[in-house]
């Protein structure tokens, strides 16, 4: 039986195995997907060594906080990873580890389904890590020319200017000044507000008087409605959580590992419903 993994620091509440194992079963693929928690960088190194030696491992997904660290161990990267400098999917190809990013594809598809136009909109990204990079790249692929980025460490937001200098303009915003400007769309890519710390929010809409955003997106899916999204809805913004993004990026990863074809919309809805029950 072939093996697939999700690696990250804390995966107790991850529903990725549910999604992937359902897809594998649907296509009759003899493989199992499971979570592996890695508490530190040393354990990440050990995991990579294990993967290289185990002939049954096809590949793995990466989540917080290793989406950037994993590149150190990869032999090749896809074009999007070369730009984004973060990966969420790795495939074993012979002796080589090849890094891909399907996060931006999942994000882009979930945004397109909501029917929100991002062109010529003032967009604020909260966070500047691997998830933020995928989000920014997805927006670029949707025609966005510039984005505002607020991060607790201003230097990290500033560093994204160099990452994306060839494709779009990054406008860093100091964390404490994130309420001063008007935005049409606000996107949270941080883990602030994720279960179990559900009272937290990366943006206090009570403090925000510059205008009501048209759309507010949270990459978090557990809880399904974060404090961040609840407050945005009270103000009148349309909102979306990260569950569809999670499912759609998983589908794209399976395509990389097994060259599967697109899944039917009815099957995707079935997966989404099962995920909603699990959260």
From Swiss-Prot:
So, what pathway does this thing act in? Metabolic intermediate biosynthesis; chorismate biosynthesis; chorismate from D-erythrose 4-phosphate and phosphoenolpyruvate: step 4/7
Give me the disulphide-bonded residues. Answer: none
- The entry marks the following residues as binding shikimate, namely 14-16, 63, 88, 103, 221
Q: Which InterPro entries match?
A: Aminoacid_DH-like_N_sf (IPR046346), NAD(P)-bd_dom_sf (IPR036291), Shikimate_DH (IPR011342), Shikimate_DH-bd_N (IPR013708), Shikimate_DH_fam (IPR022893), Shikm_DH/Glu-tRNA_Rdtase (IPR006151)
Q: Which UniProt keywords apply?
A: Amino-acid biosynthesis, Aromatic amino acid biosynthesis, NADP, Oxidoreductase
Q: Which residues form the active site?
A: 67 (proton acceptor)
> In its UniProt entry, what is this protein called?
Shikimate dehydrogenase (NADP(+))
Protein's gene: aroE
